[in-house]
Amino acid sequence: MNLIPTVIEQTNRGERAYDIYSRLLKDRIIMLGSAIDDNVANSIVSQLLFLESQDPEKDIHIYINSPGGSITAGMAIYDTMQFIKPQVSTICIGMAASMGAFLLAAGEKGKRYALPNSEVMIHQPLGGAQGQATEIEIAAKRILFLREKLNQILADRTGQPLEVLQRDTDRDNFMTAEKALEYGLIDKIFTNR
């Protein structure tokens, strides 16, 4: 069951009810709290574009608690984060794994954060293929291409050498907030406001 809390706000015209995500959006906060698929990506991209249209100079904050998901959906979010004018701050709450970790690192350098008990996990892309041998070969080439592309972007975002990224993403690589800070995936650990 997916319950979305409602908040009541007092205005000069009386009370107004918002779902919590709409209320957070007014404060330029976007929640990424699920696996990343095309629907989630479309929602996040739409919110980023909307907030840019409201004020292109003011930061946007994305809170991430995600197990990861689709590479193409995640890249749609990543490209939009880089494309829009406002700086995008990222904050890991809980777990940022796989594409969630990639998006955490994609925040504006100096504005990538994690809470003290959060975890970050990086690994190589996952995929599978079936069908004729030529189709399997095409799928394998694509996933190897994506692996190199994602590793290169992460190397640029973290300051780690590409060879280190290739080694460290070979298997699931879980990190505490402290380790993610040392690695360059985040810039600061938040303990309070």
Swiss-Prot record:
Gene Ontology terms: cellular component: cytoplasm; endopeptidase Clp complex
Q: What is its EC number?
A: 3.4.21.92
Q: Which GO terms describe its biological process?
A: protein quality control for misfolded or incompletely synthesized proteins
The organism sits in which domain of life?
Bacteria
Pfam families to which the protein is assigned, alphabetical: CLP_protease
Keyword set, alphabetical order: Cytoplasm, Hydrolase, Protease, Serine protease
NCBIfam families the record matches? clpP, PRK00277.1, PRK12553.1
Give the family from UniProt. Answer: Belongs to the peptidase S14 family.
Q: What function is annotated for this protein?
A: Cleaves peptides in various proteins in a process that requires ATP hydrolysis. Has a chymotrypsin-like activity. Plays a major role in the degradation of misfolded proteins.
Q: What is this protein called?
A: ATP-dependent Clp protease proteolytic subunit 2
Q: Which organism is it from?
A: Bacillus cereus (strain ATCC 14579 / DSM 31 / CCUG 7414 / JCM 2152 / NBRC 15305 / NCIMB 9373 / NCTC 2599 / NRRL B-3711)
